[in-house]
């Protein structure tokens, strides 16, 4: 159990090796933890608003965060210093490094008279001058705002999940939409996470389902049904398992007994779509989930401001569907 945030967690992410766990919350300060023993290594101090998203590059050298103070910041992971701070005209909802680490993408909210926009920036030689540079690509979103985002293979495309349940793939060379999923989801998408090999990704939606999609065609492969909105979903890197977390919207939560099972992490079989386990822990909805890259543990961040790291016991790895 990692205690270091004063307000609800918005996103958690492991680095590629899995030794570091990054968390951001509505209390303005992203944290980094040593995932093995839960020791807090440091905080990234500099935002003036709720931090909505973060991502770390492959080499664990740079961290990107987007916040409600209308800035995207790039940090030095080791020293905690700000490399660049990029202003925008509304709050930043998603931010991701590309696989190569040469580029980063972020999206802004549709608010204060501003439309939602997707930006791509070159971060190879990132320094304070990045704030004045024009982004390499800027795509205005005319329909629904972006709520989550992934990079496609070879840094050629970006997959966006929207507030109306749509998913789209954008070709960043042409700057236009190449695939649209249509309306597989009937309500907003809260989270999208790729599988380890990048061939498919799982979505978490307010329509109470999580779905598995093909990364290239956006064909819906599987559906995992629950009774309440799903805030986050992640795919195990070693087994055919998906974990879902959610609960009601923060506004609708009353102090209910945890026995009601509303705030459990729920494990589904990737292929059979069957729920096989639930893990308790949080005193409120789960906002973000992440599997450790070795698949032997997972972390969850909740509305209660805690990050919980749970290690699986040996029985988890025995195939229960034989």
UniProtKB/Swiss-Prot annotation:
Pfam families: EIF3I. GO terms for molecular function: RNA binding; translation initiation factor activity. The keyword Cytoplasm applies. It comes from the Eukaryota. Component of the eukaryotic translation initiation factor 3 (eIF-3) complex, which is involved in protein synthesis of a specialized repertoire of mRNAs and, together with other initiation factors, stimulates binding of mRNA and methionyl-tRNAi to the 40S ribosome. The eIF-3 complex specifically targets and initiates translation of a subset of mRNAs involved in cell proliferation. Component of the eukaryotic translation initiation factor 3 (eIF-3) complex. The eIF-3 complex interacts with pix. This is Eukaryotic translation initiation factor 3 subunit I. The gene is eIF3i.
